Protein backbone atom coordinates (compact mmCIF):
# COMPACT_ATOMS: atom_id res chain seq x y z
CA UNK A 1 0.00 0.00 0.00
CA UNK A 2 2.75 2.44 0.96
CA UNK A 3 4.57 2.08 -2.36
CA UNK A 4 1.35 2.50 -4.34
CA UNK A 5 0.29 5.57 -2.36
CA UNK A 6 3.73 7.12 -2.85
CA UNK A 7 3.54 6.55 -6.63
CA UNK A 8 0.07 8.11 -6.79
CA UNK A 9 1.14 11.14 -4.76
CA UNK A 10 4.23 11.62 -6.92
CA UNK A 11 2.42 11.26 -10.24
CA UNK A 12 -0.58 13.44 -9.32
CA UNK A 13 1.22 15.89 -7.02
CA UNK A 14 -1.68 15.50 -4.62
CA UNK A 15 -0.99 15.96 -0.92
CA UNK A 16 -3.19 13.11 0.29
CA UNK A 17 -5.23 10.17 -0.98
CA UNK A 18 -8.57 8.66 -0.09
CA UNK A 19 -8.33 4.92 0.52
CA UNK A 20 -11.33 2.70 -0.16
CA UNK A 21 -11.26 -0.92 0.93
CA UNK A 22 -13.71 -3.81 1.03
CA UNK A 23 -13.49 -6.48 3.73
CA UNK A 24 -9.84 -7.13 4.57
CA UNK A 25 -8.95 -4.15 2.35
CA UNK A 26 -10.46 -1.82 4.94
CA UNK A 27 -8.28 -3.38 7.64
CA UNK A 28 -5.21 -3.02 5.43
CA UNK A 29 -6.01 0.69 4.97
CA UNK A 30 -6.37 1.09 8.74
CA UNK A 31 -3.07 -0.68 9.38
CA UNK A 32 -1.33 1.54 6.82
CA UNK A 33 -2.59 4.68 8.55
CA UNK A 34 -2.04 3.49 12.11
CA UNK A 35 1.21 1.53 11.83
CA UNK A 36 2.91 2.11 8.48
CA UNK A 37 3.35 5.86 8.07
CA UNK A 38 0.15 6.66 6.23
CA UNK A 39 -1.10 9.28 8.67
CA UNK A 40 0.44 12.16 6.69
CA UNK A 41 -0.63 10.80 3.30
CA UNK A 42 -4.28 9.84 3.78
CA UNK A 43 -7.25 12.21 3.85
CA UNK A 44 -9.85 9.59 4.73
CA UNK A 45 -10.55 5.87 4.66
CA UNK A 46 -13.82 4.45 3.40
CA UNK A 47 -14.23 0.85 4.54
CA UNK A 48 -16.99 -1.28 3.05
CA UNK A 49 -18.04 -4.45 4.84
CA UNK A 50 -14.86 -4.44 6.90
CA UNK A 51 -14.71 -6.74 9.95
CA UNK A 52 -13.10 -4.16 12.25
CA UNK A 53 -13.53 -6.49 15.22
CA UNK A 54 -13.22 -9.73 13.25
CA UNK A 55 -15.61 -12.28 11.84
CA UNK A 56 -16.56 -15.68 13.17
CA UNK A 57 -16.32 -17.14 9.64
CA UNK A 58 -12.56 -16.50 9.55
CA UNK A 59 -12.07 -19.65 11.64
CA UNK A 60 -13.24 -21.70 8.67
CA UNK A 61 -10.71 -20.29 6.21
CA UNK A 62 -6.98 -21.08 6.08
CA UNK A 63 -4.28 -18.48 5.63
CA UNK A 64 -2.69 -15.52 7.34
CA UNK A 65 -5.33 -12.99 6.23
CA UNK A 66 -8.14 -15.13 7.62
CA UNK A 67 -6.24 -15.69 10.86
CA UNK A 68 -5.85 -11.93 11.26
CA UNK A 69 -9.61 -11.45 10.81
CA UNK A 70 -10.55 -13.92 13.54
CA UNK A 71 -12.45 -12.42 16.45
CA UNK A 72 -9.88 -11.78 19.19
CA UNK A 73 -6.80 -12.24 16.97
CA UNK A 74 -3.63 -10.58 18.21
CA UNK A 75 -3.40 -8.53 15.00
CA UNK A 76 -6.91 -7.10 15.48
CA UNK A 77 -6.29 -6.50 19.17
CA UNK A 78 -3.23 -4.43 18.30
CA UNK A 79 -5.11 -2.57 15.56
CA UNK A 80 -8.04 -1.84 17.87
CA UNK A 81 -6.02 -1.08 20.98
CA UNK A 82 -7.83 1.86 22.51
CA UNK A 83 -9.54 2.31 19.13
CA UNK A 84 -7.00 5.03 18.47
CA UNK A 85 -7.35 6.86 15.19
CA UNK A 86 -5.79 10.14 14.05
CA UNK A 87 -8.43 12.85 14.43
CA UNK A 88 -7.35 14.57 11.21
CA UNK A 89 -8.33 11.51 9.14
CA UNK A 90 -12.00 10.60 8.67
CA UNK A 91 -12.75 6.87 8.92
CA UNK A 92 -16.06 5.81 7.40
CA UNK A 93 -17.40 2.30 7.85
CA UNK A 94 -20.20 1.38 5.46
CA UNK A 95 -21.67 -1.93 6.55
CA UNK A 96 -24.72 -4.08 6.01
CA UNK A 97 -27.02 -5.33 8.72
CA UNK A 98 -27.40 -8.39 6.46
CA UNK A 99 -23.71 -9.09 5.77
CA UNK A 100 -23.30 -12.84 5.44
CA UNK A 101 -19.50 -12.81 5.91
CA UNK A 102 -18.91 -10.23 8.64
CA UNK A 103 -20.52 -12.04 11.56
CA UNK A 104 -21.56 -10.53 13.86
CA UNK A 105 -22.46 -7.57 11.65
CA UNK A 106 -21.80 -5.15 14.53
CA UNK A 107 -18.13 -6.06 14.11
CA UNK A 108 -17.99 -3.65 11.19
CA UNK A 109 -18.73 -0.69 13.45
CA UNK A 110 -15.90 1.27 14.99
CA UNK A 111 -16.22 3.77 17.82
CA UNK A 112 -13.96 6.34 16.13
CA UNK A 113 -15.70 5.98 12.77
CA UNK A 114 -18.62 7.47 10.97
CA UNK A 115 -20.66 4.25 10.83
CA UNK A 116 -23.21 4.01 8.02
CA UNK A 117 -25.57 1.02 7.95
CA UNK A 118 -27.38 -0.23 4.86
CA UNK A 119 -29.97 -2.98 4.71
CA UNK A 120 -30.67 -5.91 2.45
CA UNK A 121 -27.16 -6.40 1.07
CA UNK A 122 -24.81 -9.29 1.57
CA UNK A 123 -21.05 -8.92 1.86
CA UNK A 124 -20.36 -9.02 -1.86
CA UNK A 125 -23.64 -7.32 -2.73
CA UNK A 126 -22.22 -4.20 -1.08
CA UNK A 127 -19.80 -3.90 -4.00
CA UNK A 128 -22.57 -3.78 -6.59
CA UNK A 129 -25.06 -1.65 -4.69
CA UNK A 130 -26.11 1.69 -6.17
CA UNK A 131 -26.82 2.93 -2.62
CA UNK A 132 -23.32 2.05 -1.44
CA UNK A 133 -21.82 3.56 -4.59
CA UNK A 134 -23.60 6.83 -3.85
CA UNK A 135 -22.40 6.77 -0.24
CA UNK A 136 -18.80 6.21 -1.36
CA UNK A 137 -19.12 8.98 -3.95
CA UNK A 138 -20.34 11.41 -1.27
CA UNK A 139 -17.42 10.53 0.96
CA UNK A 140 -14.97 11.12 -1.90
CA UNK A 141 -16.52 14.50 -2.71
CA UNK A 142 -16.44 15.54 0.96
CA UNK A 143 -12.83 14.40 1.17
CA UNK A 144 -11.61 16.58 -1.68
CA UNK A 145 -13.41 19.77 -0.66
Where are these regions (language model features)?
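Serine-dependent carboxylesterase/thioesterase catalytic core
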Residues: 1-85, 101-102
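Conserved beta-strand scaffold positions in the cores of enzyme catalytic domains, especially
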Residues: 45, 91-93, 115-117
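Short, proline-enriched alpha-helix->beta-strand connector loops that line the catalytic pocket
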Residues: 85-91, 110-114
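Short beta-strand/loop motif that positions the catalytic acidic residue
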Residues: 93-95, 99
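Short alpha-helix in the alpha/beta-hydrolase fold that links the catalytic acid
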Residues: 102-110
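Histidine-bearing beta->alpha loop at or near hydrolase active sites
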Residues: 120-124
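Post-His helix in hydrolase/transferase enzymes
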Residues: 127-140
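Generic C-terminal helix-cap and adjacent flexible tail
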Residues: 141-145
Amino acid sequence: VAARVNRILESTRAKRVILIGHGLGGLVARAYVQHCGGVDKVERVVAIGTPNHGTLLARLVPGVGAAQMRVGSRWLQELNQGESWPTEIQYVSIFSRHDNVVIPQASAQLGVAKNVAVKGKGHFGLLFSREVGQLVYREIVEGVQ
